[in-house]
C-alpha cells in the first residue's frame, strides 16, 4: 500500500485553486451577510441554495442535488456540511477551512445537527432559508425534529446579489462572448432540411468551445407551429420553408450567465411575422431606454407594455419584461427569484444590476417572434453583452 492510499483524500487537494474569485471577494460578501443577520437577530444562518452558497464561498458542483448546507455565524468562521464525496470539490473551489462531510448512509439532517452540536450552536438563534429550492418539506421537518424551532433566513442573501461587482461583471461579459459564439453557430445552422437538433448541437458545441461551462438551463430551439407554444425546445423536428425558427441561448462562465433571443424567417413567411417582429424591436428599444437609474423595475416593464398595447399585441404578451442575471445552477439560467422587470416591482434600478430583457410575441400554436439582450444598468445608456445584430434573420 502506498503512502497516498493511506492519506486523507481531502489532504491531497489544494485549497481554492479553482475558485472563481480571490478570498477577499468572499470575505466582503460574508461580512455583508453578517451585518444583515445581526439586524434580524440571527446567530447562525443555514443556507442550502447552490447559488447563495456559491456567492458566499465559491463552492460549485453538479452534485448539488445532494444536501449541502452553508452555516454562516454572525461571529466566527463559516462551515459547510455536504456529502463526503463532494468535500474535495469544495476544498478545490473555496477557501473554507471547515468542511463537514457525511456518508451516503447518514441522514443529512442528522449530519447537520451533529455539526451544529459539535460547534456549540444548539440552543442559539438558528435560521434557515425557507425559500430555497433544495430544502424540501420533509427535510425541513427533519431539521426541526433535530434542532427545534428554526427562524427564517429567507431573503438574507439575495438583495446583496442584485448589484454586481466589477469582478462579477467580468464573468458575465465572458459568458456573453461564449453565448454569442453559440448563437452565431445556431443561426448558421438554421436551414430548410436541418433539424432542431442540428441547430441545438451547433449552439451548445460552439458555446462550450468558446469557454462556456454547463448552463443552468438548456437552450430553446423551436420552429414552425411548435415555436408558438412557450418553452418548447428541440425535438428532432425538420425545418421547412415558411417556418419561423426561434433561438434562445445562454452561456456560463464561473456560474455567471448571459442569455440572448434571436429569430429566423426561413423563406417566405406571413406579413404578420415581420409586423410583430418590428413591435418586438420597438418594445426592446423602449425597455432599454428606461433601464437606467432613477427608474424602477416596474417602469421598464411599463415602457415595453405600452408599445405592445399600442400595437394591439397585448394578447400575445402575457409575461414579465425581464429578470435579473448572474449566478445560476439548473433548473434556471436567470436570477428571476431576485428581481423581475414587471408590474408592482418598485425596486429602484442601480448601476451594476444586470437583466435579460426578452421581448416575445406569440401567435399561439403558429409562431413566435422574439428579440432580447442581456444588459447592465450604468449611469447612462445600458451596456449590452452581445454584438449580434438584432434584426430578423431572413433566409
What are these regions (language model features)?
Residues 1-395:
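Active-site neighborhoods and metal-handling regions in enzymes and metal-associated proteins
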